[in-house]
Regions:
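Short, small-residue-biased leader/transition segments that mark boundaries at the very start
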Residues: 1-6
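Structured adenosyl-cofactor binding patch, chiefly the S-adenosyl-L-methionine
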Residues: 14, 125-173
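Short internal beta-strands
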Residues: 28-36
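An accessory alpha-helical subdomain
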Residues: 167-203
Length: 203
């Protein structure tokens, strides 16, 4: 049920590495958001670095916008190492894994949003997320490249999702009460406009 989405990826090699990372960890849904190179998943460098995950490149889908790509998702996690003045609720990756596992047990679809290589997620992308998440890293140098971040998330998420099966636990049937991502984005934009109007937030 997990989805890996890459907004505005400019490097075919990173797309190939992403496909390899998520397939290695048992995931199979790669969504590419408005890539700078149309057909980026079919580029030679992407195919080379995907190694045995070429099938994920072949089944990956390109979307014109992040909004379009997450319409079927109930939980949208935006990965970023930067603090933001405004945006969705923030949590660390450990807490996010718990939430993802619960959503998965409830048959919800989850989107993991990774930003472009040079700039990371923009505020517009984060406004469409239900949660903002950071990975615990060296405070003086917290920047992972795209493929590294995806592999860390995919590996640790796989560990979390397998915990119940290893321990023989029954799935928790309690439903996670999550707001619609589009509704969250509209609410955050309404708040932002209000804060600008009263001079609290500098546009």
């Amino acid at each position: 049920v997990q989805t890996c989405a890459l907004p505005i990826s400019s490097h075919p090699g990173n797309v190939g590495s992403a496909a390899r990372a998520i397939k290695t960890m048992g995931f199979n849904d790669l969504r590419l958001i408005n890539p700078k190179i149309p057909g980026i998943a079919q580029q030679a460098e992407a195919i080379s670095l995907a190694s045995g995950a070429i099938d994920l490149l072949e089944t990956s889908k390109e979307y014109q916008s992040l909004e379009e790509s997450i319409k079927d998702c109930s939980l949208v996690i935006g990965l970023t190492s930067r603090d933001r003045e405004f945006g969705p609720p923030a949590m660390d990756w450990q807490a996010a894994r718990d939430l993802i596992a619960q959503t998965s047990r409830d048959q919800g679809k989850v989107a993991l949003i990774f930003g472009p290589e040079r700039t990371g997620l923009e505020n517009h992308h984060l406004s469409l997320c239900t949660h903002r998440v950071w990975l615990d890293a060296n405070p003086s140098y917290p920047s992972l490249n795209l493929a590294q971040a995806i592999m860390v998330c995919a590996y640790t998420l796989r560990e979390k999702l397998l915990e119940g099966f290893v321990a023989g636990e029954k799935p928790d049937t309690a439903s996670a009460d999550l707001a619609d991502p589009a509704a969250v984005a509209a609410m955050l934009e309404h708040w932002r406009e209000g804060l600008i109007a009263i001079g609290y937030l500098d546009p």
